[in-house]
A protein has these predicted regions:
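Arg/Lys-rich, positively charged N-terminal/basic patches that mediate binding to nucleic acids
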Residues: 1-27
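A residue-level signal for beta-strand positions that form part of recognition/binding surfaces
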Residues: 2, 43, 74
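Residues that recognize and position ribonucleotide moieties
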Residues: 2-3, 53-55
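Residues that form or immediately flank small-molecule/cofactor binding pockets and catalytic motifs
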Residues: 8, 48-51, 82
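Active-site micro-motifs of SAM-dependent methyltransferase domains
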Residues: 11, 30, 82-85
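Short histidine-centered beta-strand/loop micro-motifs
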Residues: 15, 46, 55-56, 67
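A short, surface-exposed loop/turn module that caps and links secondary-structure elements
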Residues: 29-54
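Enriched for short, Lys/Arg-rich terminal
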Residues: 57-61, 65-100
Length: 100
């Protein structure tokens, strides 16, 4: 699958180091090598959203939007946030807006 990244996601990744950064890199490689969403480990569709999914990466959560297109399947990584912040209203509202 193709992958794209938001500025927020890229900014969060730049702040990482060590094992966490390697885990994020490995997850992105797994997504690129996957032919469907079922092949991505720890990937779950969020309840109440049409196209929003999350991947658990240790104590972090990567949220992405997946629109199935006839020509290309593309995973757009939107946010990478700590688990405690992942389900706050702030991100919930942002994801709802982006889900449309």
């Amino acid at each position: 699958m193709k992958t794209k990244y938001s500025k927020d996601f890229e900014k969060s990744v730049r702040k990482l180091s060590g094992k966490t950064l390697n885990s994020v890199r490995n997850t992105i490689l797994e997504v690129r090598n996957a032919s469907c969403l079922d092949e991505i480990p720890d990937c779950k569709k969020l309840v109440g959203y049409d196209n929003v999914y999350r991947i658990r990466i240790g104590s972090l959560r990567a949220f992405f939007i997946f629109h199935i297109q006839i020509i290309d399947d593309c995973v757009f990584f939107k946010y990478l946030v700590p688990r405690g912040e992942a389900y706050d209203k702030k991100y919930e509202e942002k994801l709802r807006k982006d889900d449309k």
